[in-house]
């Protein structure tokens, strides 16, 4: 469940939380739509498998802290890149909109430090962007709202979300074939939305349409647990678990309901259309369980594979919205209070993510990599909008790495193949997105550099 205090509509906050999958700008957390596949360039190039990976401080702090044991010398890694999203939104009334969104990734950093000599412990620190989004659509607002004739004309529909995780971890190696790890830290969450929205269930305002501008931020604790087993010198098996993260954020929600009030006629058209509320948002990030394996098939050839389970069904089942301390006396009078609650359906499905990849040592310090990821979209058609189209199913990636002495660099290109989803009958109130379709594709490039010292 996702709870929002002081936004003004299910569709609005649904857009904020879910649209992250549109940009695909998310490091960590290992989801195939709303989260990116891998936090560093090597992981991304291998399909996002991190549970069994070793030798990367960023990957260990992103998914499986047990992998810190694979660090033989202190190592610092930094990763940065950019994403390019293209999309198309078509509506049955002839509206056709295009999305062109380019954004830089907030850099990720990881530090791994082995403990004292002859003591089997390694420490790690990670600062990793778990979610990054800047989805920016522009299209004509469909007729709707109370009375069915309200439109705000051509409008920007923009949602931004950031979840930045800072964590401190440690791994112990009680036996040469076994590593255990855990990390603790905090996730900083920032949300913003500017778009038309419709109240979904508020008894007095259900169906009422207005413009919304919302901004909130907050912090919550986060944890990771992991294990790696090495049954032979050529095989590494890993498993990790991330409990759900509940983040309470505070901010403001403001808007303008002029078009809706004008459509209702006197006396509503004479009312001040502007409003402001204090915003308190409760966001729940799903629990994630991952398993994976690496196999050194030949001296130069390695294969990896992994599976993730993401519990979206419990985290994004519905959206509870509470508005408080409203500034507009007329709206407060109609509602009977300066606060209100609205509930919107999300009904996301649990997701299974399948990952596979291979890397080949070319020689001269160079390594070539390729990967593939598949996951059925967690977003059901009946609640999808252009801002929530985290619908990618297939991703392919290719990368190259170079290592010389204490230094290494890895580069990856990841392509989210074009995905299209059609909405038959939307269950969002007013049905503005019924008989609509969204097509999206994305390209991501990331560079990771590291140094041992």
Q: How would you name each of these model-derived features?
A:
Residues 1-11:
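N-terminal secretory signal peptides that target proteins for export/translocation
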Residues 54-63, 68-143:
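Outer-membrane beta-barrel translocator/receptor signature
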Residues 21, 30-33, 63-68:
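Intrinsically disordered, low-complexity boundary segments flanking structured domains
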Residues 30-47, 51, 104-453:
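Outer-membrane beta-barrel porins/channels
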Residues 11-17, 177:
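Small-residue packing motifs within transmembrane alpha-helices
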Residues 15-25:
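Bacterial N-terminal signal peptides
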